[in-house]
Amino acid sequence: MGQPRAIGIIPDGNRRWASLRGENLYIAYYTGYRNVKRILTYIRDFYPAIRSVYLYVLSRDNCSKRSRAELSILYRIMRRSIERDIAEIEKGGASLVIVGDINHPNLPDNIRESLAPYHFDMYLKKGSLPDGRRVVAGLCYDPFWEIEHYTPKTLPSRLLDEIDLVIRTGGEKRLSSFFPLLTRYAELYFIDKLWPDFTREDLDRAVQWFSTRRRPMGR
């Protein structure tokens, strides 16, 4: 088995990283955000076979149940970086696709407005998804919302690439509703490291592990 064409990343463990180091949540989430950028750049430069990267930014439960204080930290980081990060993704030859309920009442208007042009719904209105490499971000994402919001023919999970490899940091061994229709045959790689400590070498090990897997995929 060669390299995966689509990988999913569940970047878990930012809060525990803060607690273990005696840092505040802003430092933890900002460090985690910087690591997302580092890993995306590494994939772009050294893994040309990977065409899609799926990131679990926030589940719909996260958007509904996390404290206002914690969400405000996350949104503050997002507001500071959205335009610059989108420009970097596009400069690197990829397209951003947002999947999830960006009309969620807990999502700030300015973030919603900045991300709306890149939402899956906007691509549907244009008639097609962007070709080439993609960064797919799950924001206020929930599979039940997806099924209720779209027709069977326009489900994101029908039109996006199926995920070959899911990497979850932080030691938890579950998917937490991470694109369940796209992970039917995904290989699941769990690592105890907390997300801010995840390195490029850890990614290399995950991809190498994937290459050893036998994947009958129902056959």
Swiss-Prot record:
HAMAP family: ISPT (MF_01139). It catalyses: geranylgeranyl diphosphate + 7 isopentenyl diphosphate = tri-trans,hepta-cis-undecaprenyl diphosphate + 7 diphosphate. The gene is uppS. Keywords: Magnesium, Metal-binding, Transferase. It comes from Aeropyrum pernix (strain ATCC 700893 / DSM 11879 / JCM 9820 / NBRC 100138 / K1). Substrate binds at G13, N14, R15, R16, W17, S59, R60, D61, R66, R168, R174, L175, S176. PANTHER family: DEHYDRODOLICHYL DIPHOSPHATE SYNTHASE COMPLEX SUBUNIT DHDDS, DEHYDRODOLICHYL DIPHOSPHATE SYNTHASE FAMILY MEMBER. Belongs to the UPP synthase family. Its cofactor is Mg(2+). Homodimer. This is Tritrans,polycis-undecaprenyl-diphosphate synthase (geranylgeranyl-diphosphate specific). PROSITE patterns: UPP_SYNTHASE (PS01066). Mg(2+) binds at D12, E187. InterPro entries: UPP_synth-like, UPP_synth-like_CS, UPP_synth-like_sf. One of its GO terms (biological process) is polyprenol biosynthetic process. It is an enzyme of class 2 (transferase). Binds 2 magnesium ions per subunit. One of its GO terms (molecular function) is magnesium ion binding. Pfam families: Prenyltransf (PF01255). Its EC number is 2.5.1.89. Catalyzes the sequential condensation of isopentenyl diphosphate (IPP) with geranylgeranyl diphosphate (GGPP) to yield (2Z,6Z,10Z,14Z,18Z,22Z,26Z,30E,34E,38E)-undecaprenyl diphosphate (tritrans,heptacis-UPP). It is probably the precursor of glycosyl carrier lipids. The active site is at D12, N62. The lineage of its organism: Archaea, Thermoproteota, Thermoprotei, Desulfurococcales, Desulfurococcaceae.
